[in-house]
Regions:
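Extended C-terminal subregions enriched in glycine
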Residues: 183-188
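Active-site microenvironments in enzyme catalytic cores
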Residues: 1-181
Length: 188
């Protein structure tokens, strides 16, 4: 979030005031989820170049991804009924790797004032493997201390984070595998 905020604003104002208080999410299209390994097309959209007054239309030049985890859920509650943080695990079947693709130049132009739309809804890659939540129990751990203190409806008890090492590698044009990011889900 800090890196993207720095791209769109500046490092001193990278995270907006609500960042530490609201769980951030985007509503994507289920029709744009593809299996891991499927080709991703380069989306077209409006972009605002720094040296031009008006936007242009064309293919993104800043295609990016975000390493994420997907949650596969059971049936939820009735429309309008709240699932508490204590109940959440009862509604989750399992987890999978999930890469959210982003067209950053399109996103930069369209995200104010309503947030990204076309820049983030064109593709998401989902692993073909789902790991049941029960299988991840031995890897439960404490998460980072949240500061500032979060609102009561977001508070939780116990080990809700999961210690999963994550990495992303890409294949270079000459066929070499290059690791481009490493993380751990317990920090997410």
């Amino acid at each position: 979030a800090f890196n993207v905020g720095s791209m769109f604003r500046d490092p001193d104002n990278a995270l907006l005031p609500n960042w530490k208080h609201i769980p951030v999410g985007y509503h994507g299209r289920s029709s744009s989820i593809v299996a891991s390994g499927e080709p991703i097309f380069r989306p077209k959209g409006q972009q605002k170049l720094n040296d031009q007054e008006n936007p242009i239309f064309g293919p993104t030049k800043l295609l990016d991804f975000e390493l994420e985890m997907g949650f596969i859920t059971f049936d939820g509650k009735s429309l309008g009924e709240h699932i508490t943080t204590d109940e959440a695990d009862h509604y989750i079947f399992g987890m999978c790797l999930f890469n959210d693709w982003s067209a950053r130049d399109i996103q930069k132009w369209e995200y104010v004032p309503l947030g990204p739309f076309l820049a983030k809804n064109f593709a998401s890659s989902m692993s073909c493997w789902i790991v049941p939540l029960d299988a991840l129990e031995p890897f439960r751990t404490n998460g980072p201390i949240q500061a500032p203190k979060i609102l009561p409806y977001l508070e939780y008890k116990g080990d809700k984070h999961i210690d999963i090492n994550l990495s992303v590698s890409i294949e270079t044009p000459n066929g070499e595998e290059k690791t481009v990011c490493n993380s751990n889900y317990k920090h997410m």
